[in-house]
Amino acid sequence: MNSHSRKITDHVYWCGVLDAALRTFDVIMNTEWGTTYNAYFIDADKPALIDTSKSYLSELYLSRVRELVDLDKVQYIVCNHFEPDHSGTLEQLLKLAPNAVPVMSKVGERFFRGLVDYDGETLIIEEDGQKLDLGNLELEFYKTPFLHWPDTMCTWLPADKALFTCDIFGCHYADDRLLSDRVGDFHQAYKYYFDVILRPFKKHLRQAMELVGHLPLEHIMVGHGPLIHGKQEVEHYWGLYEEWSQPLKPEGDKPLCFVFSASSYGMTHRLGKAAAAGAREAGMQTHFFDVNDLEPGRLIDEAEMADLILVGSDTIAGDALAPVWNALALFALVPQKRSKTAGAFGSYGWSGEAAPAIQQRLEQFKFKTPEEPLRVVLRPTEDDLAAAHAWGVRLAENALG
């Protein structure tokens, strides 16, 4: 593994690196199959490179490039996305390739300045379809923001019908065979990557696919994992993205209120069930869960489908319970949070910090929180349950607009 550069199409060479031993990526992702940092060389009259590698693999990456071209002959370095796993070698490369002009989106320039010490010429992509003349070849650029940083763009090489997408259509999967039609089944890694990296940005993904959907794609040159190679492969993986990028909808014809809570003695659960009953009275269907019974995928699905989300916890040692915080962390993966209404509730003994703390976290996620947190001391009375019911009605009415 990690042997040499590879020719992929008539004018495209892979010059990336494999990191097969990697088991955690960016702190948050398990990478049981390792990953690749894919980078590319365009063999043109004006030679160009697309993306680089993580900094600790810079020597291996540079050795790949030197197999293909003298660095002082490189004319352009296209930077589709500036996250350091794709730009970590860029500063070193610019010093070694003095004639190369870095190419980036307008938004990307801010990240470039924050990551790279460089005061030379740059080429900024201002418009979709903007072209770059490489002599015998031409590149086109399409802005695809928030997939998954604001700077992201795709690069199209018409001559080879190849689209360079960086993190879009990729996955963490290291295999020296490189091409999707040769490495075997990597669908588990492919879906996991989509869920963690791109699912929060479904709306942007649908817009990007519409933007580049007219291109006669035969190759998708991804930033991580197997290169999507051949028209049939492109159709397959494009189809998966079309399916996965659609909004999830609850069964039935009523909008969903999703409620979950952590409750040592059932008192907080009683509040949540009363609030759920109020939401049903207002015209919603409800799904109620003890947080300990929710596996992560189900929690994210429920939150995506819901128009109203209610989160509850007892207060213990001045805080919400750990399973609730762990569940809330997964909300980072939920699309369209700004369009959803949410509220927090909880029973407490003497201090009652849990519900306000949960509400603050919901607000940080940009949920709409039109009601104050609902709190009661210890066992809810009938009046408390009636108040919880009314609270649920009001929140549901807000969610229903």
Specify the residue positions occupied by each region the protein language model found.
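Conserved beta-strand hairpin/beta-sheet module of binuclear metal-dependent hydrolase folds
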Residues: 5-67, 154-157, 161-165, 257, ...
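Terminal amphipathic helices with adjacent charged low-complexity linkers/tails
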Residues: 222-254
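FMN-binding flavodoxin-like domain, especially the glycine-rich phosphate-binding loop
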Residues: 4, 175-178, 185-227, 233, ...
